C-alpha cells in the first residue's frame, strides 16, 4: 500500500501530537506508585514506535505485549527488554491484556481494520 506525502505528513503530525499530549497527561496524572504501566496490542510498525516514544518518558513501564505473530512478539519483547531491562509479559489474545488490572494505558497498534474491537474492550474495562 503506497502512501502519499500528504498522508505521511498528516500521520506523522498526528503521532507527534498524540505523543505530546500523552507526555503532558502522563506527567500530570501518575499513579500512586509514580509509574504508568502500559501495554501494546499489535507490535509492528507504528504501535511499536509509539511504545518506544512512551518508554522515553520518565515513569513509564511496559508490562505486556500482544500480537498474533509469535515471531514479532518475541522480537519486540527482546527490544523492550534491551531498552528497559525488563521483559514484558507476552500475549496472543488481546482480551487477556485488557483483563489485567495493573495496566493503566493500552496502545492499540493493530492494523486499521482491527483498531475498533480492542478499543471498545479497553474502554469498557475502564
Ranges and model annotations:
Residues 1-125:
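N-terminal glycine-/serine-/threonine-rich beta1-alpha1-beta2 phosphate-ribose binding loop
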Amino acid at each position: 500500500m503506497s502512501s502519499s506525502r500528504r498522508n505521511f505528513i498528516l500521520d506523522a503530525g498526528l503521532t507527534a501530537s498524540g505523543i505530546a499530549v500523552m507526555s503532558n497527561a502522563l506527567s500530570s496524572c501518575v499513579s500512586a506508585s509514580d509509574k504508568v504501566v502500559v501495554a501494546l496490542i499489535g507490535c509492528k510498525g507504528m504501535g511499536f514506535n509509539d511504545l518506544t516514544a512512551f518508554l522515553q518518558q520518565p515513569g513509564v513501564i511496559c508490562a505486556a505485549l500482544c500480537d498474533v505473530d509469535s515471531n514479532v512478539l518475541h522480537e519486540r519483547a527482546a527490544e523492550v527488554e534491551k531498552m528497559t531491562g525488563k521483559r514484558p509479559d507476552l500475549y496472543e489474545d488481546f482480551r487477556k491484556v485488557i483483563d489485567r488490572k495493573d495496566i493503566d494505558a493500552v496502545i492499540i497498534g493493530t492494523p486499521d481494520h482491527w483498531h475498533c474491537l480492542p478499543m471498545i474492550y479497553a474502554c469498557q474495562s475502564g
